[in-house]
């Protein structure tokens, strides 16, 4: 469906949990963020209902995010549910990969098409520093398992102020050797004084934005930087989605106080 500015909105990002097993320095504080109560998090059946309705309205792509989506117990069951939704052409996931290895085959069998794996360095010590608690061996095992399962794999590398050119070159060589894609993303603050660098890949400009977000608590967010949140009315899901699309601004705010961990992936 089209928004008020003529953009075709056909991409739904679904945060299945606000929990994460890592504490990446650019994403959330070391002590984490205030977590939702379990009873406030959407059930798989509720997520499926929203996705089915979105598909009937013309949405064609769904991406599961978090938090860390694989931290949600039984997420492979959710993938299988969504994999059966008629009209959804692409079912994807963004993950840190550390819990992916034992689940990759089941996720692919359930209908997952692709994974974006966050991997900012190949150096074990730096990986531990950046994630505060992660083991790079787990992430690399996840990459290999995803490839073996037949999933399309893309690495997301956040390039920070102290990232050496040699690290970027090493990651490019690693991705090329695995036959997978690499996207480098400039570390961006949501504050105006630190914008993305044009040297690296960037999110699509507002004029080409085709997505809305469903947060883990059932809130629909039409824009990454938006302060307008709409709770899904499960007696009128179509109306809720339509209202979120209509509320999508022509462009996002110049700055925001939200952290990366608070914007639903």
Where does each model-flagged region fall?
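Accessory C-terminal segments flanking Radical SAM cores
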Residues: 188-265
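N-terminal [4Fe-4S]-dependent radical SAM core
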Residues: 1-13, 23-25, 56, 250-265
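Short, well-ordered alpha-helices that flank and scaffold nucleotide-derived cofactor binding pockets
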Residues: 29, 52, 80, 84, ...
